[in-house]
């Protein structure tokens, strides 16, 4: 069974880390999923954020529903027909402190929770921008900047019971954006990624202190097919609640997704037409093609 590659960010992407950079490039191209260490996010902040998220989910339902927005993927998402065990909180732009303040205010979150969420969102935004830059550098694009790309922040809880063991928590899907950085539940596994070579799902077991990175659909399109958008799912493996925290780097600020010219040549002709990310997200919703199939509709 394939192992999830582990990348030390202190080595990857720099001039002296050619071997680690090559491993990063291979992980993105082959599996579309890897772990990162050397990320600089303090263990104490990770623990504080996990406690804050659990406190938010333990709020009464009426308080949680006050944080419901009309923007898809933002606000409170209650359990539904497709994923009855799953609920989430979303922040549409985690890079904007005002959005974080508004999110906490609608929940009447206490000051220490607000400060934890703000500090964590800031560190995670820096981390995902750094990871994206190193991924781009592994493809030879050393000047690419992702600082102003919108980011979505999502807190997830899976309300597992004994009856749900063995059932799906979230169905098979790809992420629609460029990259996802995920802090897993340190006690409960369940995340599985598809190994395209073997056609089998591989468990991503918890590893405290590390983050899991997934390549999404925009990552595959922007890289002209060099990066692999990983299919993944969440399975219930234990009758206990499972909490995870995700940061999504979505698409360029102007919403336009197009492979840079440096990644298009005679041997690598352009694979996808230029498209708007919001249009693509709506395409996924309207077609129900949420596991990367919708990209084929944008073939050049």
From Swiss-Prot:
InterPro entries per UniProt: DIOX_N, IPNS-like_FE2OG_OXY, IPNS-like_sf, Iron_ascorbate_oxido_reductase, Oxoglu/Fe-dep_dioxygenase_dom
GO biological process, one term: auxin catabolic process
Consequence of gene disruption: Male sterility and production of parthenocarpic seeds. Increased levels of free IAA in anthers and ovaries.
The organism's place on the tree of life at top rank: Eukaryota
The EC number(s) this enzyme carries: 1.14.11.-
Cofactor(s) in the UniProt record: Fe(2+)
Gene3D superfamilies referenced in this protein's UniProt entry, alphabetically: B-lactam Antibiotic, Isopenicillin N Synthase, Chain (2.60.120.330)
UniProt-recorded Gene Ontology molecular function terms: 2-oxoglutarate-dependent dioxygenase activity; metal ion binding
This protein's record includes keyword Oxidoreductase: yes
Binding-site residues, 2-oxoglutarate: 242
Cofactor detail note: Binds 1 Fe(2+) ion per subunit.
SUPFAM superfamilies from the UniProt entry: Clavaminate synthase-like (SSF51197)
Signal peptide residues on this chain, from the entry's feature table: none
Keywords: Dioxygenase, Iron, Metal-binding, Oxidoreductase
Principal EC category: oxidoreductase
Ranges where the Fe2OG dioxygenase domain occurs: 149-252
Amino acids binding Fe cation: 173, 175, 232
Family label: Belongs to the iron/ascorbate-dependent oxidoreductase family.
Described purpose of this protein according to its UniProt entry: 2-oxoglutarate-dependent dioxygenase essential for auxin catabolism and maintenance of auxin homeostasis in reproductive organs. Catalyzes the irreversible oxidation of indole-3-acetic acid (IAA) to the biologically inactive 2-oxoindole-3-acetic acid (OxIAA).
Protein name: 2-oxoglutarate-dependent dioxygenase DAO
Source organism: Oryza sativa subsp. japonica
């Amino acid at each position: 069974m394939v192992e999830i590659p582990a990348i030390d960010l202190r080595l990857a992407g720099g001039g002296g880390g050619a071997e680690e950079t090559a491993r990063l490039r291979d992980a993105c191209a082959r599996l579309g999923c890897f772990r990162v260490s050397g990320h600089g996010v303090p263990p104490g902040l990770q623990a504080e954020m996990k406690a804050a998220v659990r406190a938010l989910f333990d709020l009464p339902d009426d308080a949680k529903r006050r944080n419901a927005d009309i923007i898809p993927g933002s606000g409170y998402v209650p359990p539904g027909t497709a994923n009855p065990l799953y609920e989430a909180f979303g922040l549409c732009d985690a890079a904007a402190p005002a959005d974080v303040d508004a999110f906490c205010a609608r929940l009447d979150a206490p000051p220490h929770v607000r400060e934890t969420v703000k500090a964590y969102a800031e560190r995670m935004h820096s981390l995902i921008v750094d990871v994206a830059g190193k991924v781009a550098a592994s493809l030879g694009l050393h000047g690419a900047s992702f600082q102003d790309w919108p980011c979505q922040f999502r807190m997830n809880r899976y309300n597992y019971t004994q009856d749900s063991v063995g059932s799906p928590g979230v169905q098979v899907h790809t992420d629609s954006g460029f990259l996802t950085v995920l802090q897993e539940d340190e006690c409960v596994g369940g995340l599985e990624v598809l190994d395209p070579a073997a056609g089998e799902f591989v468990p991503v077991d918890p590893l405290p202190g590390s983050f899991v990175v997934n390549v999404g659909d925009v990552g595959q399109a922007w890289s002209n097919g060099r990066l692999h958008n990983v299919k993944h799912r969440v399975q219930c493996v234990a009758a206990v609640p499972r909490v995870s925290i995700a940061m999504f780097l979505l698409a360029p600020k102007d919403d336009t997704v197009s492979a840079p010219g440096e990644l298009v040549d005679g041997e690598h002709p352009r694979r996808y037409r230029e498209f708007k990310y919001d249009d693509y997200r709506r395409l996924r919703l309207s077609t129900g093609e949420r596991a990367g199939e919708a990209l084929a509709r944008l073939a050049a």
